[in-house]
Structure formats: C-alpha cells, structure tokens
C-alpha cells in the first residue's frame, strides 16, 4: 500500500501575516517549540507516572498545575483535551439526563453539543441582535427566573468572549445573578484565558474552561478546567474500580506534546496577559482605520474589548460582483501582499484578529486593505 501525500506543510500560513482569530493566540514561543521537539513522542510525559497524570513529578506536572491554578484563580485545576471536554465533564458531573442548562445566545456550538451529548435541555439567553449582539446580566436574570419557575436549572454557561463577534461579556455581573438564584456558573474562556487576565475567584464563577491551542500558545488539543473547591468531590470523583483515576476525565487527559508545550508556554503567557490593554488599543485602531475606508462596519459591542473582530464588508462584495475573480479576489489580493487567514470566496463579511502583531504589522494590514479598495473600486 502506498500512502497519499497528506500535504503536511503550513509554509503559507507561517511565512505570512495570519489574520485567522483561531490561530493568533496559539502561536508557540521558542520555549514551547523546544518542548515540542523534546516531548513529541507518544506518551512522553508518562515515563515516571504512578497512575495519576496530575501527580507526575518528572516533568513537574504537579507543580505546573499549582501554577496554573494560581494563574486562573482556581482552587483546583486539570488539563483536558479542550474547552469542549471541560464543559462536557462539568455537565456530566452536575446533571442527569433530562435536566436543564441555561446558555447564552452567542454560545459556541460545542456548548450545545456537550449539553446534547449529556441529554440535557437547553434554554438560551438571547443577545440584543444586530448590530451589537450583546448578552447582558439582565437578560440572564430574566431567563433564569422564568426558567426556574418551571424547572430546576442545574447549570448556567456563559461565553466569556464569543467566536462570532468577539464580545467580552460581563462575567462578574452574570455570576452575581447566578449566585443569588443558586445556579452554578461555568465560564467558557476559550478566547480569553491566556490572552487577557481571567481569575475565577475575582469573577465569582464556579468553573472556568480554557483552550491551550486557541489562546494559551500551546499545541492542540489541550484545554484547562478550573473550579472552586466545593466542586472538587463532584467533578473530580474517583472511579470505583480504578481508585486512582478521576472518572469524569476518563483517567488521564492530554499527554505528550500538547501538555509539554502548555507547560513551557505558561511563563510567556503569564507575562503577555499584562499587555492586554495594548492589544485592545491596536484592535480599536484597526477598526477605526478600516471603517474610515468606507463600506466596512464592525459588528459587536463598541468600543472593542477583544482582539477578535467581525466586519460587514459591502464594499468588497460590491467589488466582487464585477471583478473577474468574483468572490476570490479579496483572498488573492491579500495573499499577494503576504496576508492570509481570510476565507477564500468570502466578501460579504469576515472575522480577523491582529493579536500579537507589532504596530508596524498592523499598519501594513490597514494599508493593504485600503490599497485593495482603491485599486479595485
């Protein structure tokens, strides 16, 4: 049997400015690339394991988890395969089939899948709709009170920053509402933990989940699950047959390269969140400059509080209507200028992020969009 050529190269994405929001927070620093080489083989972190991944001392996973708990303001923390697995584990531990959970209208599809796989009923908190798509504590209060009148709500889930509009929600405000109504709250921080400061205790939530590969400069798949101490016995309960193994995590979770790169990146990530205000400033500049071109409008809450931006772009859609390359022209014009990350054929709208770019790179992106409009309008 001959295997196909699987096209295992990312030269285009590595050698150009990548605007894809999925990629910006997962770029590995030098220390993580070294760890990737060192721990790339299979179960490489398990050479000295005595049955519990969180207790491995060589490499010092136990110490790393202590530092990770401190970083996230959690009483207990575990690595999981991704934020979605963290959400599923919490739902499975707290709920029974047929129970009800309340989620926000901007929730990631994996929140819905985690609930569906657990056999749960989903009640949605609506956003304000176009153009801001904001989810507010008041909306949570109204939906929770109305739902609690009918059924018991076992868990509320809030998306800290959503992947469609990049709205940073008022997590502390929603947590206050949930606490008063006696409903535990899980905060989905896939787009925030590792980019901006996230502290479970300060926000007043019960659980946080994060994404190492999306926002914490790690290889995927790996996520973070943090919790208050009061939930440890429930979520981290042990197997009756294999007494060392934590049942909801199916024993050991992410091993090898993903875990090693997350460990290696933590010092870098801890430092970079202190520069979050600068990232917001750059993003607001991008929005201002692109909107100044005309025919481009930012969706979501204003002013921006996160690097992920969604733009409506009728100017590019109008150009595409008469351009020989139709909807592919924007992708191709950007690629010629060394910019990637916008989907091929997409001109009505697009999402982008300049997280981690220098001011010079941001200016180059702005100038490139302006030039494309001027040359093709």
Curated annotation (Swiss-Prot):
Enzyme class, broadest EC rank: transferase
Chemical reaction(s) catalysed: O-phospho-L-seryl-tRNA(Cys) + hydrogen sulfide + H(+) = L-cysteinyl-tRNA(Cys) + phosphate
Needed cofactors: pyridoxal 5'-phosphate
Keywords on record: Protein biosynthesis, Pyridoxal phosphate, Transferase
Function (record text): Converts O-phospho-L-seryl-tRNA(Cys) (Sep-tRNA(Cys)) to L-cysteinyl-tRNA(Cys) (Cys-tRNA(Cys)).
UniProt similarity note: Belongs to the SepCysS family.
Protein name: O-phospho-L-seryl-tRNA:Cys-tRNA synthase
Source organism of this protein record: Methanothermobacter thermautotrophicus (strain ATCC 29096 / DSM 1053 / JCM 10044 / NBRC 100330 / Delta H) (Methanobacterium thermoautotrophicum)
């Amino acid at each position: 049997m001959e295997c196909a050529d699987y096209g295992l190269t990312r030269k285009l994405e590595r050698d150009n400015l990548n605007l894809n929001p999925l990629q910006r927070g997962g770029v590995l620093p030098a220390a993580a690339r070294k760890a990737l080489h060192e721990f790339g083989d299979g179960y490489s972190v398990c050479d000295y394991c005595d049955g519990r991944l969180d207790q491995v001392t060589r490499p010092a996973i136990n110490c790393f988890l202590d530092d990770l708990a401190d970083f996230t303001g959690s009483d207990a923390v575990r690595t999981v395969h991704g934020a979605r697995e963290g959400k599923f584990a919490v739902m499975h531990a707290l709920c029974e089939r047929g129970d009800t959970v309340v989620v926000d209208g901007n929730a990631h599809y994996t929140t819905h899948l985690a609930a569906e796989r657990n056999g749960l009923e989903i009640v949605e908190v609506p956003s304000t709709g176009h153009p801001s798509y904001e989810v507010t504590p008041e909306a949570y209060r109204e939906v929770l009170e109305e739902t609690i009148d009918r059924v018991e709500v076992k868990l509320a889930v809030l998306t800290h920053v959503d992947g469609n509009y990049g709205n940073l929600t008022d997590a502390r405000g929603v947590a206050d509402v949930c606490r008063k109504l006696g409903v535990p709250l899980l905060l989905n921080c896939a787009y925030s933990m590792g980019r901006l400061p996230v502290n479970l205790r300060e926000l007043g939530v019960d659980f946080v989940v994060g994404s190492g590969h999306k926002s914490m400069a790690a290889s995927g798949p790996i996520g973070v699950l943090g919790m208050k101490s009061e939930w440890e016995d429930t979520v981290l309960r042990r197997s009756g047959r294999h007494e060392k193994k934590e049942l909801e995590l199916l024993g050991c979770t992410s091993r090898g390269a993903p875990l090693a790169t997350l460990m290696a990146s933590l010092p870098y990530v801890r430092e970079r969140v202190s520069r979050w205000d600068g990232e917001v400033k750059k993003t607001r500049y991008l929005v201002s400059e692109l909107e100044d071109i005309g025919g481009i409008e930012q969706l979501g809450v204003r002013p921006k509080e996160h690097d992920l931006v969604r733009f409506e772009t009728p100017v590019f859609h109008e150009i595409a209507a008469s351009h020989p390359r139709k909807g592919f022209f924007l992708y191709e014009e950007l690629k010629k200028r060394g910019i990637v990350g916008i989907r091929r054929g997409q001109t009505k709208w697009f999402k982008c992020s300049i997280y981690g770019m220098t001011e010079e790179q941001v200016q180059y992106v702005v100038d490139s969009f302006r030039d494309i409009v001027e040359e093709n309008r």
